[in-house]
């Protein structure tokens, strides 16, 4: 069988997952490993090629030379090229991180740049410089006075580019990445969600047999896709527990039950624990305490219900690839509150463990799930409890649910729901003076939050048209008597976070 996996050695940096996502977008499977992964770990993936990328400037970083003895193509990007040069006997330097767009001139006759423009713009660290090339390397591109902006040793199949094709996402930059994958590494573009679903369903059937699987279903994208995929494999042997803690958005709990129980035919157990959660949250104002109480209470409810069901062999959870990259251990901060401590399972099933968020959404569509579930807005595990500043009460939840529903409805009506990555309402703990029916009022202030982002590590506040904001505000203050003022949050992340609590 032909090698099909690309190993990416990560040098660190805030955007370390971008190159992996670009490779996956080319329908090629890749694994992200730390730059100092031992050679046997790399060999275990039987890679068709290796990419070295990252943006952390550290002159102390070194590479294991045996990487270049694996007889597979290697591509260094940005700092990755500098590291290749230093490791193989050349000289390279970098002063700081000053990334700017620059005009790049390339040798379009080389297979790495085949089909790309001779001149194009790319992001590059202006202070990065290759002073002396290693033996038998040649230059393929130049940037201003830097003649070694891309290098190659075709005999070793080792290449480097100082610029970052993963940032541009233009026709030229993607062409360069595809040339490395398809012309040099000779992989095939066979990594699709249809391919993944077929293979995973087959392997899970063989692994599980007639044993039972329990899934904690929150209704979020990850747990929902996880449940549907597992059900496709084992049918009625899957049991999903949905804990309705009363902190969801308007009609959300009913929609989750309708789809999974009525339409999908999954063994679905909805547990009404609204009063239980509200009682635990009574008098609590600190956001961290709210989060811990909700997480702990979820676990208690989950444990109680799981023990009523009887013997369960496996637990399924919606861990996704970014979770795995953040920690070498099983994630304990799953969107349903964490793994139960004292329920024994033979194993954990994580069907989405190798997928990025966009791949999870694509898998959901491939499995026939409706867009409204697949493209559901990101929603914090503690739900509306952390979108109510201060103590959580049923009255406040009802107010926020209605206001949030109006905001989401108006955003959807004007077609902005696919352009804005996250948008929601926050019920503040402030009141203001207002006028209604010629009488003085003293009611709640509601804040609206909307952001655009690619990775949720940073975000820009969304420039929603004033006419839309005006309509949202007018509807909220007219339809919800408990609110008499609406404000819009225009703060980026950083310095703010996306959520208020």
Language model regions located:
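RNA-binding accessory domains that recognize and position tRNA/RNA substrates
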Residues: 1-52, 56-59, 63, 68-70, ...
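A generic "binding-loop/recognition-motif" signal
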Residues: 12, 80, 320-321
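Short beta-strand-loop/turn "lid" adjacent to the catalytic site in phosphate-handling enzymes
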Residues: 320-329
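Short, well-ordered beta-to-alpha junction loops that form the rim of enzyme active sites
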Residues: 163, 317-321
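Gly/Ala-rich beta-loop-alpha elbow adjacent to hydrolase catalytic centers
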Residues: 76, 80, 85
């Amino acid at each position: 069988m032909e090698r099909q996996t690309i190993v990416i050695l990560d040098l660190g940096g805030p955007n370390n997952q971008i190159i992996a996502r670009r490779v996956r977008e080319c329908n090629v499977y890749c694994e992200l490993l730390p730059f100092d992964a031992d050679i046997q770990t790399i060999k275990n993936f039987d890679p068709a090629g290796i990419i070295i990328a990252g943006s952390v400037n550290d002159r102390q970083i070194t590479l294991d030379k045996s990487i270049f003895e694996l007889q597979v193509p290697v591509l260094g990007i940005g700092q990755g090229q500098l590291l290749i040069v230093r490791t193989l006997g050349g000289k390279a330097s970098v002063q700081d991180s000053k990334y700017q767009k620059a005009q790049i001139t390339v040798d379009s006759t080389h297979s790495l740049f085949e089909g790309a423009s001779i001149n194009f713009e790319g992001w590059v660290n202006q202070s990065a410089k290759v002073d002396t090339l290693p033996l038998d390397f040649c230059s393929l591109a130049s940037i201003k006075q830097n003649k070694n902006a891309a290098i190659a040793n075709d005999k070793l199949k080792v290449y480097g580019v100082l610029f970052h094709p993963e940032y541009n996402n233009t026709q030229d930059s993607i062409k360069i990445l595809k040339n490395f994958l398809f012309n040099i590494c000779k992989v095939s573009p066979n990594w699709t969600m249809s391919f993944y679903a077929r293979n995973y369903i087959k392997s899970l059937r063989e692994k599980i047999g007639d044993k039972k699987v329990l899934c904690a279903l929150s209704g979020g994208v990850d747990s929902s896709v996880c449940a549907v995929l597992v059900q496709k494999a084992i049918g009625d042997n899957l049991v999903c527990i949905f804990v309705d803690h009363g902190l969801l958005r308007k009609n959300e709990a009913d929609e989750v039950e309708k789809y999974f129980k009525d339409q999908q035919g999954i063994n679905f157990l909805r547990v009404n624990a609204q009063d239980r959660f509200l009682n635990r949250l009574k008098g609590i104002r600190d956001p961290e305490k709210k989060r811990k109480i909700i997480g702990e209470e979820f676990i208690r409810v989950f444990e109680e219900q799981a023990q009523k069901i009887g013997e369960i062999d496996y637990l399924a959870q919606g861990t996704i690839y970014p979770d795995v990259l953040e920690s070498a251990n099983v994630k304990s901060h799953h969107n349903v509150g964490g793994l139960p401590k004292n329920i024994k399972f033979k194993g954990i099933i994580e069907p989405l463990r190798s997928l990025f968020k966009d791949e999870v959404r694509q898998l959901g569509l491939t499995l026939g799930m409706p867009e409204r579930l697949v493209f559901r807005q990101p929603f914090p595990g503690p739900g509306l409890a952390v979108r109510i500043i201060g103590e959580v009460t049923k009255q406040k939840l009802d107010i926020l649910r209605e206001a949030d529903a109006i905001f989401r409805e108006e955003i959807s009506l004007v077609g902005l729901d696919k352009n804005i990555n996250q948008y929601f309402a926050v019920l503040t703990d402030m009141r203001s003076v207002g006028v209604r029916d010629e009488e003085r009022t003293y009611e709640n202030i509601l804040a609206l939050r909307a952001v655009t982002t690619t990775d949720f590590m940073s975000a820009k506040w969304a420039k929603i048209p004033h006419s839309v904001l005006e309509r949202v505000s007018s509807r909220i203050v007219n339809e919800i008597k408990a609110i008499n003022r609406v404000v819009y949050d225009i703060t980026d992340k950083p310095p703010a976070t996306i959520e208020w609590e």
